[in-house]
C-alpha cells in the first residue's frame, strides 16, 4: 500500500509540476473536497463548479507554500498561494479562509479527519510564512545590513556585481601599467576619484568589507564611480572618429550605379544653376570657352514662347577628348552647312552611358524645351528621334553607348577635319554663312524630303509624350544631311562662341514652320524606311542586355510604362489581326 501511495504521489507531483515548475514536494492531500463561495449581497453561501482532490505543496520560490484543488468537473482548478495575508477558520466539516483580495471561501471535506489535519497543517504553514515575512522586515530596517541583504541568503546580486567590478578594475590597472607607462598619471587620478567615493560610504561598511573581503554597494555607487573613468576615453574616441569622418566620407563616397563599366576621370566642377554643365567641363583641355551671347531678337522670341534656354545636362565623367576633336572645337562661320554639322558631330564629347548619366526630371525639362521653343526643336528631334516612340524596337533604345562610339569613330575616320583657328571665335556670323548650298543631285533632294517628312511627325509625337528612356547624347548619321539651319545654329552655339545676328533666327523660324507644314501627312512607307536607316549595326551581348534591362526596370518607372504600352499595342494588333 505504501508503494502504491508513493507511486500515486509521484504521478500527482509530476502533474502539478506541469502547471507550476517551482513545486518541489507534496505536503498533504485529501480525496474529496468541494468549494463554496460567500456572496455578501445575498448573505449566503453558493456552491461553485470546483470539486476534486486537494493538494498542499511546497515551492522553491516565494511563496513557499500553496494549495490547489484539481477539478474533476471541468478544467478550471483552484490555485491559492499561502502567505501572511490568509486567514483560516475551522467549522466542521468546513474550513473557511479569506485571501488577500478579501474573497471568502469555504472548503467542504468528505472526511472530518482530513478537515482537522488540513486545518492544522494550514495553521503551521501560515505561522511559518508570518515569521519569514517579519524576519525580512527586520533585515530591511537593520543598519548593519546594506540594501536589506542578510548573510545567510545564498545569492547576493549586488555583492557579485561589486566583486566583478573590483576584479575588472584590478585587471585594467595591471594592463595599463604594463602596456603604457605614460598613462600612469591618469590612472592615479582615477584611483584618487575612486578613493574619494569610497570615503563617502559609512565607516561601518568599510570595516565590514575589510574583514569579510566583500563590499556592498548600492546601484548608484556601483555605476556612479565608473562613469568618470570611462567618460574621457569615450570623448577621445569620438573626437578621433570625427577627425576621420571627412576623409572617409570623401574616399568612400559611392558613385552612381551603372549597368556598364566606364573609365573614371576627374571632371571639372559642376554648375549648380538649373542643372547646366558647361561644355568645357567635359573635355580635358585646360582652356575654357567664352560664353555664348544671345542677340535681343532671340531673347524676345524665347520669352514669348516661355521656353527654358538651358541645354540637356551631361554627366561630368567622360573619356578624354581626342586631338582631332580638340582641333575642331571652333567652327568658322563661313563654312558650308554640311561641313559645320560634321564638325558639330566630331566635337561632341564622348559620354558615359545615358542610361545612368541623366535623371528623369532633366529629361522632362528637355522635352518641354523641345515642345515649346522653335529654335531647339530640330536638335532635340535628331537626338531623341529613336527613343521617343513606343513602336521603336526596344533593342534600339538599349544600344546607346556602342552606337555613339561607332558614329564617332566613323566621323573621325571619314570626315574631313576643319582647320582650327581661335580668332574666328569672336567674329560675327553673317547671314550668308547660313544660306543652304544648292543641292547636288536628285538623290540628295529625295533623301532630304523623306527625312523631313519623318522627323516632323516624330517631333509632334515626342511633344505629346513623356520621356520614356534617357535621351541619346549623339547626332544620328542618317539625320546629318537632313536637319535645317536651326540645327546648325544650336550646335555651333553650344560648341563655339560665335555671335549670331537677328536675321538668322528669323530665317530659322520660317524654315522650321515650313518643315512642320511639309511633314503634316507622313506615309507609312517613309516611316519604315527611316526606321530601317536608323537601325544600329552593333548587337549587345546577352549579359549586357540583361544588365541594362534589369537596371532600367528597377530604377526607371517611365521605361517600365513604355514596355507596358508597347506590350498593349502589340497585344491589340495581334487581336485585330486574329479578328480579321
Swiss-Prot record:
Q: Which residues carry this modification: Phosphothreonine?
A: 348, 401, 526, 529
The modified positions for Asymmetric dimethylarginine read 376
Q: Which Pfam families match?
A: DCP1, mRNA_decap_C
One biological process GO term for this chain?
A: deadenylation-independent decapping of nuclear-transcribed mRNA
Q: Where in the cell is it found?
A: Cytoplasm, P-body; Nucleus
- Record site: (Microbial infection) Cleavage: 238-239
Which region ranges are annotated with the description Disordered?
132-154, 172-209, 245-276, 343-371, 510-533
Which positions bear Phosphoserine? 62, 142, 179-180, 319, 334, 353, 422, 520-521, 523
Taxonomically, which superkingdom?
Eukaryota
The UniProt keywords, alphabetically, are: Cytoplasm, Hydrolase, Methylation, Nonsense-mediated mRNA decay, Nucleus, Phosphoprotein
Could you say which EC number(s) this protein's record lists?
3.6.1.62
The reaction(s) this protein catalyses: a 5'-end (N(7)-methyl 5'-triphosphoguanosine)-ribonucleoside in mRNA + H2O = N(7)-methyl-GDP + a 5'-end phospho-ribonucleoside in mRNA + 2 H(+)
> What are its GO cellular component terms?
nucleus; P-body
Compositional bias ranges of the Low complexity kind? 253-264
Q: What does this protein do?
A: Necessary for the degradation of mRNAs, both in normal mRNA turnover and in nonsense-mediated mRNA decay. Removes the 7-methyl guanine cap structure from mRNA molecules, yielding a 5'-phosphorylated mRNA fragment and 7m-GDP. Contributes to the transactivation of target genes after stimulation by TGFB1. Essential for embryonic development.
Question: Assembly and partners?
Answer: Forms a complex with EDC3, DCP2, DDX6 and EDC4/HEDLS, within this complex directly interacts with EDC3. Part of a cytoplasmic complex containing proteins involved in mRNA decay, including XRN1 and LSM1. Interacts with DCP1B. Interacts with DCP2. Interacts with DDX17 in an RNA-independent manner. Interacts with PNRC2. Interacts with SMAD4. Interacts with UPF1. Interacts with ZC3HAV1. Interacts with ZFP36L1. Interacts with NBDY. Interacts with DHX34; the interaction is RNA-independent.
What is the protein name stated in its UniProt record? mRNA-decapping enzyme 1A
Q: What is the organism of origin for this protein?
A: Sus scrofa
Amino acid at each position: 500500500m505504501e508503494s502504491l501511495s508513493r507511486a500515486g504521489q509521484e504521478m500527482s507531483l509530476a502533474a502539478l509540476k506541469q502547471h507550476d515548475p517551482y513545486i518541489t514536494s507534496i505536503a498533504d492531500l485529501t480525496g474529496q473536497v468541494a468549494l463554496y463561495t460567500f456572496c455578501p449581497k445575498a448573505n449566503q453561501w453558493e456552491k461553485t463548479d470546483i470539486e476534486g482532490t486537494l493538494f498542499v505543496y511546497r515551492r522553491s520560490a516565494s511563496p513557499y507554500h500553496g494549495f490547489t484543488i484539481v477539478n474533476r468537473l471541468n478544467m478550471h482548478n483552484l490555485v491559492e498561494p499561502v502567505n501572511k495575508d490568509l486567514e483560516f477558520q475551522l467549522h466542521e466539516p468546513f474550513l473557511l479562509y479569506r485571501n488577500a483580495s478579501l474573497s471568502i471561501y469555504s472548503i467542504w471535506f468528505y472526511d472530518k479527519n482530513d478537515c482537522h489535519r488540513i486545518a492544522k497543517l494550514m495553521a503551521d504553514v501560515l505561522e511559518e510564512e508570518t515569521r519569514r515575512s517579519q524576519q525580512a522586515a527586520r533585515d530591511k530596517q537593520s543598519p548593519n545590513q546594506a540594501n536589506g541583504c542578510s548573510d545567510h541568503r545564498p545569492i547576493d546580486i549586488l555583492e557579485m556585481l561589486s566583486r566583478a567590478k573590483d576584479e575588472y578594475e584590478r585587471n585594467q590597472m595591471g594592463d595599463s601599467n604594463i602596456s603604457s607607462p605614460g598613462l600612469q598619471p591618469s590612472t592615479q587620478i582615477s584611483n584618487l576619484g575612486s578613493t574619494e567615493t569610497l570615503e563617502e560610504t559609512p565607516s561601518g561598511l568599510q570595516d565590514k568589507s575589510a574583514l569579510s573581503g566583500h563590499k556592498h554597494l548600492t546601484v548608484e555607487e556601483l555605476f556612479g564611480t565608473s562613469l568618470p573613468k570611462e567618460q574621457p576615453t569615450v570623448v577621445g574616441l569620438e573626437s578621433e572618429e570625427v577627425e576621420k569622418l571627412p576623409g572617409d566620407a570623401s574616399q568612400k563616397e559611392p558613385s552612381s550605379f551603372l549597368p556598364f563599366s566606364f573609365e573614371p576621370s576627374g571632371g571639372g566642377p559642376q554648375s549648380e544653376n538649373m542643372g547646366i554643365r558647361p561644355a568645357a567641363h567635359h573635355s580635358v583641355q585646360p582652356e575654357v570657352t567664352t560664353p555664348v551671347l544671345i542677340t535681343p531678337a532671340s531673347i524676345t522670341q524665347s520669352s514669348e514662347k516661355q521656353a527654358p534656354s538651358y541645354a540637356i545636362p551631361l554627366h561630368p565623367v567622360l573619356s578624354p577628348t581626342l586631338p582631332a576633336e580638340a582641333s575642331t572645337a571652333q567652327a568658322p562661320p563661313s563654312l558650308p552647312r554640311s561641313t559645320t554639322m560634321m564638325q558639330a558631330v566630331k566635337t561632341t564629347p564622348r559620354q558615359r552611358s545615358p542610361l545612368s548619366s541623366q535623371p528623369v526630371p532633366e529629361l522632362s525639362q528637355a522635352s518641354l524645351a523641345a515642345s515649346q521653343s522653335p529654335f531647339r526643336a530640330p536638335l532635340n528631334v535628331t537626338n531623341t528621334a529613336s527613343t521617343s516612340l513606343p513602336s521603336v524596337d526596344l533593342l534600339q533604345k538599349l544600344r546607346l553607348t556602342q552606337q555613339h562610339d561607332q558614329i564617332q569613330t566613323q566621323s573621325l575616320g571619314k570626315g574631313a577635319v576643319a582647320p582650327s583657328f581661335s580668332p574666328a571665335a569672336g567674329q560675327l556670323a553673317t547671314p550668308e554663312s547660313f544660306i543652304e548650298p544648292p543641292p547636288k543631285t536628285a538623290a540628295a533632294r529625295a533623301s532630304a524630303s523623306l527625312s523631313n517628312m519623318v522627323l516632323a511627325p516624330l517631333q509632334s509625337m515626342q511633344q505629346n509624350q513623356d520621356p520614356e528612356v534617357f535621351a541619346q547624347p549623339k547626332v544620328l548619321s542618317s539625320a546629318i544631311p537632313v536637319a535645317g539651319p536651326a540645327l546648325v545654329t544650336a550646335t555651333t552655339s553650344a560648341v563655339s562662341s560665335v555671335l549670331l545676328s537677328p536675321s538668322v533666327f528669323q530665317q530659322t523660324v520660317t524654315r522650321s514652320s515650313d518643315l512642320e507644314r511639309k511633314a503634316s501627312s507622313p506615309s507609312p512607307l517613309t516611316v519604315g524606311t527611316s526606321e530601317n536607316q536608323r537601325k544600329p549595326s552593333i548587337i549587345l551581348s546577352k549579359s549586357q542586355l540583361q544588365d541594362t534591362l534589369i537596371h532600367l526596370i528597377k530604377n526607371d518607372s517611365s521605361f517600365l510604362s513604355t514596355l507596358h504600352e508597347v506590350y498593349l499595342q502589340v497585344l491589340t494588333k495581334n487581336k485585330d489581326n486574329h479578328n480579321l
